[in-house]
Amino acid sequence: MVTIEPVKDSPTYPLLDTEYIISIIDQHASDTAVLLLPGIQFYSGQLFDIKTITAHAQSRGIFVIWDLAHAVGNVPLQLHDWNVDAAAWCSYKYINAGPGAIGGLFVHSRNSQTSAPVFQNRLSGWWGSEKATRFAMTNEFKPTPGAAGFQLSNPSIMDLTSLCASLEVFALSDMATLRERSIRLTGYLERLLVALQAEVGQFTIITPRDPTQRGAQLSLKLEDGLLDVVMQELEERSVVVDERKPDVIRVAPAPLYNNFGDVWVFIQAFAEALRVALTVKEKNAVLPGSDKLLQTI
């Protein structure tokens, strides 16, 4: 297995340029069967050029699968039109179906594999068999065309119910409208963060500044020794964000239910949290040999 990792000395670290990804594909194309990449990178929040990367990898004879956990419900996707071979995702992030909810699968129609003898190279559970023959008990697998043919067993009714409830909300709008609102929300967040950075410092935005290269998320890399106190202070102010050790927090205003007022409240809380964390860090720095954080006042 070959991993595609950002170059640490690169001025764009930790981002991955499309050209760099393509160069790694070319370097290993002769002995690569499958390319698996995230649509949006979970750590940096970078949105990859799915269409371009897919086309290039396929031109080198590589089967392309996308992990869309952080992309589905976040950015518009046209998997069939982009000729993606297959994709998978969860539904508890931007789809809002809740933890443990059922995931999703896309399989391009050309990869349906509905005729023998290729069935042995695929998932072939009984729930993926055609409905007309599913209970015939012939010991013969006849898959349903498309992603449905890759199901193994009947899904949980409770999981489906929570997903359907969320999809009903999405159906009241469309991804183009949600994406437009998301760009404005995250753009507003970015603008306030840039102003705070100039005033307080102590963090950098590592997510691409180009809205077309990101979703709702902005990842903020904190200066050393601030993360734990910042997270504690945000929690005490009823602000929920995500942390990635050792020094990154992920902030994602969701266009379905967050508004510009929420973004403003976050910035005020984050500014206060940074100031408290910096004070604690400075106090600890004058205590030789201390390996414990002082309690915040």
Regions found by a protein language model. Give the residues of each.
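Pyridoxal 5′-phosphate
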Residues: M1-I297
